[in-house]
Amino acid sequence: DRSVSRGLGDVYKRQPQKLSTIKAALLLPFQEDKRMVEYYEGFLMAVDSLKRTGVSLDLYVYDSGKDISTLNTILAKNEMKSMNIIIGPMHQNQIKPLSDFAEKNDIRLVIPFSQKGEEVFKNPAIYQINTPQSYLYSEVYEHFTRQFPNANVIFIEPSSADKEKAEFISGLKQELKSKGIPMRTVSESATKETLKATLRSDKENIFIPTSGSNVLLIKVLPQLTLLVRENPAEKIHLFGYPEWQTYTRDHLENFFELDVYFYSSFYTNTLFPAAVQFTNAYHKWYSKDLASKYPNYAMLGFDTGFFFLKGLSLYSSELENNLPKMNLTPIQTGFKFQRVNNWGGFINKKVFFIRFTKNFELVKLDFE
């Protein structure tokens, strides 16, 4: 029955029943932010590719504005109660009322942008795509110590401390200490000789700036590059942050020479086959080029739309029990959902490491 929205409450009561038509609603502030339009454009491409494989879908799209009153007007519409899934909102103030509505009506709610919000801890039907930092960090630490079990870590401190990375760095130091991994700290103005004195021949030497800024990179890259050239026998890497994606073009040669790694929960490269295909299709659909910002919102819309709508078409009310089987190759954003507690929803804990190898290869390391 198309009008019955089957949600988490039903999982324990009935056998899964195929949804004859998936009903999905997008609630985003389209007029206010052009990235929301890009997200919608990508989402629409996902809907189209699923329809081509025979999935029956009804998509409802509403401009949610920024006020709770606008949201309430939309939620009062009859059709909203029969949705299988709602994607939105963008604004923080709309999350709680939308979450309450979704929970009351047994509807899955996918929150694509916000990292904050307590609702995911209380509502079992919420999926939070943008991982809260603390969850992301613990995932990065685990991957780091797996990738570099024999590391010698050298932190590079800027002259004025970067508060933004303080939590990440202090957590990483704790993790390294517990694993017995040696570490030391040098300043951004360290000479090549000072840097050389920190190296250990029996270990992988990993330099980690304690700031994600391009300014710090510009300062340390010349000395590190000389260090690598003059010590070819040593294993040396530079490890960094998601925002390095935006500076890659400026430092590409250095990144390859320094065998750079950075972590991110989203990454695409215009040379990856899936990205090439998507970029061409987007151009054909909309007669314009993709925005070059990161993350790319059209790709985010596609990845999110494809994952959840495909999941509902395959598993309907049993989606939550089959999440690990959803093994899709994302264009940009990967998904690895984990329930936050017994009565809460899911957060996305997916993290990639991106590596620029000395052979001029770009590798996306997936840890699952």
Give the ranges of each region predicted by the language model.
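Glycine- and acidic-residue-enriched helix-capping/strand-helix junction motifs
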Residues: 32-43, 162-166
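Signal peptide-proximal N-terminal region
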Residues: 38-59, 63
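Single conserved hydrophobic/aromatic residue that forms the stacking wall/gate
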Residues: 1-12
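Segments of small-molecule ligand-sensing domains
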Residues: 288-295, 306-362
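Extracellular/periplasmic periplasmic-binding protein-like sensory domains
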Residues: 221-298
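Short, well-structured alpha-helical segments in soluble
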Residues: 68-84, 194-202
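Periplasmic-binding protein-like
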Residues: 26, 81-91, 109-113, 152-158, ...
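Extracytoplasmic ligand/sensor domains, especially the bilobed periplasmic-binding protein
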Residues: 87-89, 93-156, 161-169, 247
